[in-house]
Amino acid sequence: HEVLPGVEIGDIGPKLGYMAKENGYLRFKDIKLPSSALLSRFWEISKNGELITKGNPKILYSAMMKVRIFLLLASAQALGKSVAIALRYSCLRKQFKDSQKQEIPIISYQLQRYKLFPLLARSFAMLSTYKKIKDIVNQTNIEVKQGIFKNFQETHILLSGSKALFTSWALDGSVICMQCCGGHGYAQSSGIPGIMQTIAPNTILEGENTVLFLQVGQFLLKNARYIKEGKIERVSNHCKYLTQLFESEQLIDTFKIDVSTVN
């Protein structure tokens, strides 16, 4: 098959991870497209060249919520797998001898436990948190279909922060698990490098984590401003705890908190 004149297609090439999915590009040169061929379900361009949005943009974002929910589960599962590999290795791998001249499994060393046990607990916490957030998102999507957007922003922030936190935890935790396995962890046969390659793109796709963390920060500061101005009724349910912060003037002075410029 050959493309038509003026049409260029190609593959973007190898990536760090997500190799099972092919990503390509499409380029048009000196081609006129009729407006009827733009597949414009949610947008259209008028005869004057103006972009017109159809429907509520929030409904479009609700589709992204489903992908971010999947990323929460994938992150929890990935960290759990990495921890399981590292713990099993630590129980079998022996290093140095005790007073009885018996080699000691490295899981007996305090440093190994210090690095792995919190990750084990975190993986279970991530799974339970994922289930709770999934229920919240599903309920919000039901409300959105009914034209109710009361809880939409709060759900968006909750999911954005969770996506950034979970994907960062999964990748950083898998690196620690690899290090806990020494040279064996670096080998592809350990399984951990493959996990890391799979989840590495998750910190970027569906919202780069730094941007998502900043969105959460802005949301918190906005609610802090409401509290400072006495507009308690506008404070998000998830931010009620911030009222305790403003009960302590000393704490405010310590951190030099200024919420007056937050939009």
Region spans (language model):
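Flavin-dependent oxidoreductase catalytic core characteristic
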Residues: 1-263
